[in-house]
Amino acid sequence: MPLLLTGKKFHNDLNKNKCLAMFAPLEGGYETRLLRRMRAKGFKTYITSARGLGDPEVFLLKLHGIRPPHLGHQSIGRNGALGEVQQVIPQASELFNENDKDKLLWLLEGQVLSQSELESLIKICTSDNKLKIVVEMGGSRKLEWKSLNDYILNEF
């Protein structure tokens, strides 16, 4: 029985566009098959949710601070009015440990991202030649994808 999803067309489109908007059936399974195919082709992959991403460039690539949740009355003499800021390493830092491999960042629940956040993801792809990004933008009856640029032009 032949493979129904070899990943060749997906791989070619990903290399050509660098940033793809993906629409997959809601029952799932397609993203893991494609991730497995991309790993076999030499990509280092990282999958995460787009919820709570904030500024994508800072959150994914740079050292940034976060504030812990407010847990009731605390003294402000020690930390000031805004509270303590903890430094956090970039979420996708493990992708950038190896410079020789192509990198694939897969974002789930991408429909919550605004137009400016999607444009920021495209800028990240153009600045780093080895980085490719796939953003799942919602469900569909069949697996389909298009360039993130085309998606932004048509949807917003």
Swiss-Prot record:
Catalytic activity field: a plastoquinone + NADH + (n+1) H(+)(in) = a plastoquinol + NAD(+) + n H(+)(out); a plastoquinone + NADPH + (n+1) H(+)(in) = a plastoquinol + NADP(+) + n H(+)(out)
EC number assigned by the record: 7.1.1.-
GO CC list: plasma membrane-derived thylakoid membrane
Annotated keywords: Membrane, NAD, NADP, Plastoquinone, Quinone, Thylakoid, Translocase, Transport
GO MF annotation, one: quinone binding
Enzyme category, top tier: translocase
Database matches in InterPro entries: NAD(P)H-quinone_OxRdtase_su_N (IPR020874)
Membrane topology per record: Peripheral membrane protein
Domain of life, source organism: Bacteria
Subcellular location: Cellular thylakoid membrane
Record has Transport as a keyword: yes
Biological function: NDH-1 shuttles electrons from an unknown electron donor, via FMN and iron-sulfur (Fe-S) centers, to quinones in the respiratory and/or the photosynthetic chain. The immediate electron acceptor for the enzyme in this species is believed to be plastoquinone. Couples the redox reaction to proton translocation, and thus conserves the redox energy in a proton gradient. Cyanobacterial NDH-1 also plays a role in inorganic carbon-concentration.
Subunit structure as annotated in this protein's UniProt entry: NDH-1 can be composed of about 15 different subunits; different subcomplexes with different compositions have been identified which probably have different functions.
Similarity remark: Belongs to the complex I NdhN subunit family.
Name by which UniProt lists this protein: NAD(P)H-quinone oxidoreductase subunit N
Gene (UniProt): ndhN
